[in-house]
Amino acid sequence: MITFSFKFAYVTPYSSIPLLHSFSIFYSSYQISNILSNFYSLLFVHLYCRPYAIVNVY
């Protein structure tokens, strides 16, 4: 889950890091398997973090 949190911290703006860090703690508390956590993290990056990354670039 370390890569899970660092991935969001790298892509999203700085204001969203605490919120996404709380999400990573929430998911790790339920101990989701690596396959599911990787799938949901990639899906979340694709749906949520990409618009913020595009906004940060422009």
Curated annotation (Swiss-Prot):
It comes from the Viruses. This is Uncharacterized 6.8 kDa protein. It comes from Thermoproteus tenax virus 1 (strain KRA1) (TTV1).
